[in-house]
Amino acid sequence: MKSPCTAIVTAMLILMAGDVEGQAPDASKTDKAVISRLSVQFGINSKIITHLDLTPTFQTKSRWSLVIAKQPDEESSVEDGGGNRIGAVSICFVENGEPDCSEEMLLAKYREAKISFVAGEHPFYELFASDVVFSGPGRTLPLLRIKSCTNRGFNGNCGVSTFLFAYDRNADKFRVVFFNMTGRNNNEETRLVQSGPLLGNVIVAYPTSNAPFTYFVEVHKRTSDSEYSRVLTYRGTTGYGDGNALAVIDSEMPETLRRLGLWKIGDPLPVPPNTRCARLVMRKGVEWCDPH
């Protein structure tokens, strides 16, 4: 038989648990608020494609959610390079149930980079990623990542934007700490490193425009609660269409680490994340997946 004290404590715990559960955000209500807000903005009822409750992971003061919606393609007046109608993607931050779908802090980054868009077009038409990534050891220092694409050209190419957001506890707001845009047709990549000696860094690989046709590699690092800043840029030796099964960032990793003083010839080769390669080798300063 439980003692009176035990029963009281148990009852208090049940009441506390019920109170916390009662404070949980109503995702359906939030989504409806976003759809209503976007309908007023664009005159089109969008469909919710992402809903992330940011409160638990970032331990936010207010209730924060990320809600992303897409306009139905058939109701859009915008066409892609192939003549197909394509609906815009809208990104909304929701604080205590109140959606902000203005995307002003995202658009500000485009203006800073002097990137403009065709009149009447939206910056986002395809969503590649909307998730939480970790920039510290043991899945710490979370960042919110959004990766999206502009309207596609006739060859399918588009501008791939990568945004990383950190939670500012003092301001109780999310803010952009990293932004860039690349193409997508030539093995470009922007990657937040989540393990190894470059944990928390962002690596970018993008093609050169003149011979020899290789790739530029950049490393961006964040210190304290500041934005990311570039700490390394070099022209790599990975060639276009060289047949290497590794991504450009992985093929260039030994050289990237060497230039940062984190690897030297004779050290074990860096193992790419999620690799299925049975044998890694070096060829002319580039890491290769050897199929033989």
Task: Label each PLM-derived region with a short phrase.
Residues 1-5:
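Positively charged n-region of N-terminal signal peptides that target proteins for export
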Residues 154-205:
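Short helix-loop boundary/capping segments
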